[in-house]
Amino acid sequence: MATMRVNACSVAYEVIGDGRPWAITPGGRFSKDSPGVRELATALAERGNRVLIWDRPNCGASEVCFTGTSESAMQADALAALLQELDMTPAVIVGGSGGSRVSLLTAARHRDVAAGLAMWWISGGVFGLMTLGVHYCGGSLKAAWNGGMEAVAELPEWAEVIERNPANRQRFLEQDPATFIATMERWMAVYCACGDELVPGLQDADARQLRVPALVFRSGASDFNHTRATSEQLAALLPDARLVEPPWGDGEWNHRSAARPGGRGEGLFIGWPALAPVLQAWADEMVGSPA
């Protein structure tokens, strides 16, 4: 595992294979080591690609960072900078769940870094978005309000980033509680469902202007976190998008997420390697040969 400082934050990453540049971003605050992520990267590398997997700021072994208009925008800017530093632009930028949002924002905010864009499990709908704001920001905001930054550093949701990068604990403690609370409120507000942002942080008008080959996998009808309507509407918004069915059944997300709390599941992303043939065929057709 290597690290690189981008935008004043140290980011952990790995590059697998050689060929056309790709970047894979998982969802939640899960790391690049979550089962299924590396396996997808390896499957793409075996098809002649150079694939970046990385820990976003606030994930895995990377540093915590509390700048930016939103957490996803901050992570998108970090991905763009990392790809540029690694001489991997333009890249095919792909991701699922929260990783799809980061991928989309990366392409929208940094047009020159994206050769193509593929997304699945795109968060949306009033319920899906409102719960995300609480999930990502609510616990930290409440802890900082009631117990200061010591209480934030003790939250289970931050245990992995402190365990894998112990210096992160001090980074939490160095935050001014009032400023941190304001950041959490700002980040939370981005998830408020509104009529002109299908995907939080990206105006629909800007999505309509994003001229990059895009592949959107249709969400399951049973998935209320990443609604089918959101995937269909995003495919309609993006001018060069193709909507396709995923290589798994309707209940993939629900099945994987239901298994996690009891420790019975293999991980949310374990099915991702099945995407490789579809992604490769689409990239060969729509993205073209790497420079």
Kindly label every feature range from the protein language model.
Residues 74-91:
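Conserved acidic catalytic loop of the alpha/beta-hydrolase fold
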Residues 54-72, 254-255:
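Glycine-rich "HGGG/HGxG" loop immediately N-terminal to the catalytic nucleophile
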Residues 128-131, 146-190, 197:
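Conserved alpha/beta-hydrolase catalytic His-Asp/Glu region
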Residues 101-104, 108-109, 113-145:
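Flexible "cap/lid" loop of the alpha/beta hydrolase fold
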Residues 8-63:
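Conserved HGGG/HGGXW glycine-rich cap/lid loop of the alpha/beta-hydrolase fold
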Residues 240-291:
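Catalytic active-site module of serine/aspartate enzymes centered on a nucleophile-bearing elbow/loop
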Residues 186-237, 242-246:
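Conserved serine/cysteine hydrolase catalytic core
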Residues 95-97:
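Conserved alpha/beta-hydrolase "nucleophile elbow" surrounding the catalytic nucleophile
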